[in-house]
Amino acid sequence: MKFAPYIGCWRRYGPWTACDRTMRLPQDQNVMESMKTLSIRVGLTISTGLFLILPLVYGQSPANANGAEPVPIEYSTIQYISSNDSSAAIAEKAAKVLPRPNQTAWMRLERTFFVHFGPNTFRGVEWGNGREDPSVFNPTELDADQWVRAIKESGGKMVVLVCKHHDGFNLWPTRYSNHSVATSPWRGGKGNVVREVADAARKYGVELGVYLSPADLYQLRTNPTNPNGYYGNESEKLRSVIPTDPASFKTNPSNGREPAPGFKSFTYTVDDYNRYFLNELYELLTEYGPIREVWFDGANPDPSVHEDYDYAAWYDLIRNLQPQAMIFGKGPDARWVGNESGIGRTTEWSVVPLSSSPDTFRWPDMTAQDIGSLSKLTAGSYLWWYPAETNVPILHGWFWAPRKPTRSAAELIDIYYQSVGRNGNWLLNLSPDTRGLIPDNQLAQLRLMAQVVDETFAKNLAVGGKLTADNSNKANSASLALDGNLDTWWEAAPGQRTAMLTLKLPKAATFDVVSLQEAVDHRGQRIESFSIDAWDGSKWNKMDEQTTVGHKRLLRWNSPVTTDQVRIRITGSRLEPTLAEMGLFKQAELVQPPVISERDINGSVTIDSAKGLPVVYTLDGTVPTPRSTVYRSAIAIPRGGEVYAACVAPDGRLGMVASKYFAGLAPIGWKVVSADSQEANSPASYAIDGNPNTIWQTRLTADLALPHQLTVDMGSPHRIAGFTYLPRQDGSHNGVVENYRFETSVHGHDWITNVDSGRFGNIQNNSELQEVPFAPVSARFFRFTALKELGTNGWTSAAEISVLPAESEAGR
């Protein structure tokens, strides 16, 4: 670790002040074991560019192992677990890790939005290849104002724009690449999407974040359309001034250009690609106003070409140019929750152990279910505040494509409770279409979700009640958890790890949502378990029992409860528990959506209304109205499509909309001609049975060499223009196909190769339906070949495989 002295210490919400801090150095850090407690004025600077609150706390508390006087454990943004720490000391250290100021501001945003837009939108793919012609990017009605206005009206506090995805296409006219809007026909090559989004964000008071993909396939040294690409070109590391003069980028990178107004230049010793990346970062961070988040994706679409990312230089530049910005993903400030479904863990700790100091830690994805329990906090670990961000697209995919279905408002509401309500920051992606507009089907579901959430939390039914606790710190009474201020809080009495708080309301209230928030910004995350009880007039009834709270925990019940007394029992805590706020809420009264069935093997779909209400539906992609077709019997959808349905209340109100997308032809009369391997209880026929919950699985203990093939006879010729692959939906990656070949035939011989060597980009993180278009052909037979799986076992699995009808077929 690198220590640099400072005259003073950092105060959380104020200026520097002189102070002494007690610190014990770790015994395994090349420090003499006889070294005693030092009382020094010190600050800790690491290459991430962070300034950390001190002290770093080492040693044992409350009782030192060798009988020395206990070392006080202070609040800090980092703690270190030494080999002689007791379990009590470890718990206390974890409870005294605090978020940094940029994290506090970010966590309080709660509802934030992604926007994915670029050449992929026009090509109907999730991952581009860097070989796209910039002329493909030509939106006809691009309106960034519409995007940001929709975000603002939906309760969004920040928009994170994908400024450059893996294809390397820049949505701003960068000085350092020809693969950008400047070489596209849009706005005559004079357009700048980043500028238009930044202006709209400023107009609507929405914070701005930027996504810049570390992987850049346009700059790949093996890209034939850019043979002089920087990525993986094994160039020498040279002294480079950022921003670099584009004219001398390769020949003399120490020659800088004029810095942006109000900013200065920086010098790093880096190779060509890192110099290129730093210059693009510099443009984004100096020309578009304040940046709240910098989003680094961990995906690498072509790992065959190696490039070392100089994260230390990247972080240093960000901290200097936009010190308030969060660095997400491959960075020290916020982590990916581990899925692309927007779902947080039921036990979500914001304090996590690092195996090395933040100075050298590589910030890998943390996808295990348990990443922060006390059992994970072991000797040699550094404890660090690292909150979760949950991301999910409103479509079943990140970029718009004509057939991608939209998530219903009901599903989005569920995700809200499982993201924001599970100690996470929610990042919901919107996907403008080829016009450059967010389509109505996305907006309709987004607005309904926001309406329900906003109406639900408009009134806290606990306000006006009296909150008491069976024990309290003298300075932190229970009433402070009902004052609407996250910077005041109730805290249990010293030494207490459990508590019981009772809320007595002036009159009975009916509610079905409970909100709890710890004082994480001042006291860290502590609560390990709690229960909620309701009084029925004669006894207490347990309504719910959960684990962590953190910044926010939301409990939503299927049935409301009416009572005038509520009890919160905190049954486990790492240190004296705290509550900054609590609330009781009643969900907005809306008619619940009907249930749309899966499509059966004959291509039929049924719709069920639990309360027997009439149901209306559409098949043309529009949201139903009370005048839409009334559901009376099973709907035939043999060639695929999307069903939208809603119940109609007795007063004529339309309920929440349900939707379900059915891709490809129904497997009517299909049969498996051959499969080179199959488990007896997971036969190949399960890949064409219309049931997403069954799978074809190759043998687990034999036939362990790829490729594996499945050949299907569709019974009659069809005009098709693509195929679909649904990976297994049980959460396992066993046999999930990553690389494939797809072939078709009219007679079962003389095969045509439609896709020779395709790849399902991002399938490891996104188990949604994969659609692969190709030029229309006539075929009766198709053959799917798995070339590579996500694992290394030589297996293949599939929930469903189908084909996409060509336009003429779809209209039959």
Locations of regions flagged by a protein language model:
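N-terminal secretory signal peptides that target proteins for export/translocation
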Residues: 1-40
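Aromatic, loop-rich ligand-recognition surfaces of beta-strand-rich domains
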Residues: 9-12, 441-448, 452-459, 483-592, ...
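Short beta-strand segments within Ig-like beta-sandwich modules, predominantly Fibronectin type-III
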Residues: 544-548, 623-631, 761-763
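Short, compositionally stereotyped local motifs that mark structural "simplifiers"
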Residues: 587-709
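Bacterial N-terminal signal peptides
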Residues: 43-55
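Mature catalytic domains of secreted/periplasmic carbohydrate-active enzymes
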Residues: 61-483, 488-497, 503, 515-517, ...
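Short, solvent-exposed loop/turn elements at domain surfaces
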Residues: 120-126, 399-401, 475-478, 625-626, ...
